[in-house]
Regions:
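Hydrophobic core segments of alpha-helical transmembrane domains in multi-pass membrane transport
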Residues: 6-17, 81-85, 120, 137, ...
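Juxtamembrane interface elements at the cytosolic ends of transmembrane helices
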Residues: 13-27, 87-101, 164, 168-171, ...
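C-terminal membrane-solvent junction of multi-pass transporters and transport-like membrane proteins
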Residues: 26-43, 151, 395-467, 476-480
Length: 480
């Protein structure tokens, strides 16, 4: 009952924020927050939107199999955020876009525009469903199975809660709710770390030294080119993951486009980029501490990395407070990710697919429809997924965000004009070719593609657009 009471109290606060920010909200407020968002709130809220429930569960467990090598990817993230801030944001602000995929219509044509928007809908719906599924499974495990509540009911109830507090204010509401949820998530993480350190009988300086001396604190891998943990694979993948999953993601860019000016948007992007490194370092450090904790009580580590955090909390030895903190942290992380995803999906559908940005009736209907489809995706993923959740998201991104990367790079960095009618076929063929290459190379050479599959996918799309016959040239590169 404590967990249920915690969630209800948390949700009441979100509803209060929604009531305040949703007053007299029209479509412009829902889609763009009237372009009046303070940059520092956007920057802080984006931490919670990116560090989802998946991060809360999976990143601490990564140290079991790959030590702290995930930090190599996080270092790449920093350069990726600077690239987005100074290469993509100027284009979006100059064109005064509501959705970033409108750029594809201006530069490449209507088929490319619809293709990009459609791929985003699939990519974001899939990735957000993965993240949200984590919270639903954990709530089932901790509370709801005891009361015999089926998993589908849990999913429907939580999505309905999100719909309630986002249905009026949209992105204007989310700027504030994401700030609140990020505060809750980070406080929960820090307090959990403190509680684990206290249980181990250490001071904070002693714990920091113990983590640094632990064999699982190893970060850099330079000597194994075959390994997925090789530095250059992870670092370069981190750069492109951010460019694609933030810079080409309507969800993330929609918040940035609510800032008053380009300069403020760039400040918020760079600030957030730097903040991502210490945040993930805390999650990985928690993973090392949890392994120390299991060793100290003589308990075997779980078979699956994703269960490291869950087993520590479910065991009960860390106390009821940790259970409450964990619930707050993971619900905050998941809600801040899912609510913005539903808003971005609704925006893209209304503006890009239907071409009716001022139709409030359509927006309200689309918001309900997107929520229903979101529920279906969660249920599908719950019953078919068996891989590590964080890897699942990035694998999905490699196949669905890759064509977006190729289309945007082609439009921004060349003066050529694509054969617009062929773009949908290119966007479908590229992921299929990547899947075939990944399978063949793995079986014949033993080389395993990591997150760099995203770059390969984008490169194939770019080359196909570049070399296939184009219609008559008449458009210049936006980056002239």
């Amino acid at each position: 009952m404590i967990i249920i009471a915690t969630i209800l109290a948390y949700f009441c606060i979100l509803l209060l924020i929604s009531k305040i920010t949703g007053h007299k909200a029209d479509n412009d407020a829902f889609f763009r927050a009237n372009r009046q968002s303070p940059w520092y709130l956007v920057a802080f809220g984006m931490i919670g939107a990116s560090i989802s429930g998946v991060t809360f569960v999976s990143v601490p467990g990564m140290v079991m199999l790959s030590d702290m090598t995930y930090m190599q990817t996080c270092l790449g993230f920093v350069l990726g955020y600077f690239a987005v801030a100074y290469l993509l944001l100027p284009v979006y602000y100059r064109l005064k876009l509501t959705t970033i995929y409108s750029y594809l219509q201006t530069r490449l044509g209507n088929y490319s525009y619809k293709t990009g928007a459609s791929f985003f809908l699939l990519s974001k719906m899939t990735g957000a469903a993965v993240r949200f599924c984590v919270v639903c499974m954990i709530l089932q495990r901790f509370v709801l199975d005891t009361y015999g509540i089926p998993f589908p009911i849990t999913v429907v109830a939580l999505v309905a809660l999100i719909w309630l507090y986002t249905r009026r204010g949209g992105i204007r509401t989310l700027v504030l709710t994401d700030t609140f949820q990020t505060i809750c998530m980070l406080l929960a993480l820090i307090l959990i770390i403190y509680k684990v350190v206290e249980t181990l009988g250490m001071s904070l300086p002693e714990a920091a030294q113990a983590i640094a001396n632990d064999s699982h604190s190893h970060i850099f891998v330079f000597d194994d080119w075959v390994s997925k943990q090789n530095f250059w694979k992870q670092f370069l993948s981190g750069i492109f993951i951010v460019i694609v999953m933030t810079g080409l993601d309507q969800d993330m860019m929609q918040k940035n486009l609510t800032c008053k000016t380009l300069r403020e948007a760039q400040k918020d992007m760079c600030t957030y980029g730097f903040a991502f490194v210490p945040a993930n370092l805390l999650f990985l450090s928690l993973g090392v501490l949890l392994m120390m904790y299991f060793n100290s009580i003589g308990q075997a580590l779980p078979d699956e990395p994703d269960n490291l955090m869950l087993q520590a909390v479910a065991g009960g030895q860390l106390g009821t407070l940790v259970v409450i903190l964990f619930t707050i942290g993971i619900v905050a992380a998941c809600f801040s990710s899912a609510d913005s995803a539903l808003t971005a999906l609704t925006t893209t559908y209304c503006v890009d697919i239907c071409g009716r940005p001022k139709d409030e009736k359509l927006r309200k209907q689309a918001h309900i429809g997107v929520s229903i489809v979101f529920i279906l995706f969660i249920l599908i993923f719950r019953y078919v997924n068996s891989t590590s959740l964080i890897d699942a998201i990035y694998t999905i991104a490699s196949y669905t965000y890759g064509p977006l990367l190729g289309l945007f790079v082609f439009g921004l960095c060349t003066k050529r004009v694509v054969n617009d009618r062929l773009t949908p076929y290119i966007a479908v063929a590229s992921p299929l070719l990547c899947f075939a290459l990944d399978t063949i190379v793995s079986k014949t050479t033993g080389y395993k593609f990591g997150y760099e599959l995203l770059m390969l996918n984008g490169l194939i799309t770019f080359l196909a657009c570049f070399f296939l016959p184009a219609r008559k040239q008449g458009l210049d590169c936006e980056m002239k």
